[in-house]
Design a protein with these regions (language model features):
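General beta-strand structural signal in soluble alpha/beta enzymes
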Residues: 15, 60, 87-90, 107
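Conserved small/polar residues in nucleotide/adenosyl-binding loops
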Residues: 119-121
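Conserved N-terminal beta1-alpha1 strand-loop-helix module at the mouth
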Residues: 1-62, 66-68, 83
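Short, hinge-like loop/turn segments at secondary-structure boundaries
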Residues: 53, 76-79, 104-108
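Short, Asp-centered acidic motifs that coordinate Mg2+ and/or phosphate
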Residues: 33, 86, 104
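Active-site-adjacent beta->alpha loops and helix N-cap segments on the catalytic face
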Residues: 38-51, 67-72, 89-103, 112-117
Length: 121
């Protein structure tokens, strides 16, 4: 089992951060895993290193890294740049590539309740 998966089973609370202030708070918290939900190609390496330096696992939402494309090569680029423990994405092609690279993956999905929209018509 992937080390991140084992950690999530033991500690199911995950910090999800978008700002530097939230990252600082998450680094000081007992959470062992941090989901990075906002970054740029210029900042993601430093943010992941801060998380790793604190002894925590870093999972990067690759769709929200400004400056990366939505092509499969983006997974390889991100992995070479900052070595995250895993990625989050809504794109199945990126999820498959990340799995083949040994990264833990979280596929984000949006679910719409179509029955609810019919009630309001």
């Amino acid at each position: 089992m992937h080390p991140l998966a084992e950690t999530l089973l033991d500690e199911p609370v995950i910090a999800a951060v978008k700002t530097d202030e939230a990252l600082t708070a998450a680094l000081a918290s007992p959470c062992s895993t941090i989901f990075l939900l906002a970054s740029t190609l210029l900042t993601v390496d430093g943010l992941v290193h801060r998380i790793h330096d604190a002894g925590k696992l870093a999972v990067v939402h690759i769709d929200l890294v400004d400056g990366l494309s939505s092509r499969e090569i983006a997974v390889d680029s991100l992995n070479a740049l900052c070595h995250p423990d895993g990625i989050i994405s809504t794109r199945p092609t990126l999820i498959r590539r990340a799995r083949h690279r040994g990264l833990l993956t979280v596929q984000r999905a949006f679910i719409l309740d179509s029955l609810l929209s019919l009630i309001h018509i």
